Amino acid sequence: MNKKELVKYFYEVIVSENMLDELPKYISENCVQRTGVKTYLIGVDGMKQHLLALKKTYPDYTMKIIRQYIADDYVISEFIMRGTHKGDFIGITPTNKVLEITGVDIDKVIDGKIVEHGGATNTFETFFEHHLIKPV
């Protein structure tokens, strides 16, 4: 698999099908989370905790990659995440509605593993559309 295929498979199969035992095949023990200019060591365990937290909020969520770009070792993936809102999320009470949230992930892949992960999700549009947040 090339880098784009690896990242797409990771999100659409490993993450979407909750195959957390497979994480060590795709995530480096030295994987960092990039937030702006800061990085935080998360490794396999940190990625697992992140995915478990998402599954508490959206137990059936899946990810669909709709576009990808590559620059050196970085794979930029535009995605749609779809799942039923069944758990509390940043103080928002579960709605049991199926929500679709768009986003972009930026993953650095070295030697067949993700060594750096970052990105952003556009929760505003979805939450506004479903009246989970209101204008001020």
Task: Describe the predicted segments one by one.
Residues 1-136:
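C-terminal and inter-domain tail/linker signature
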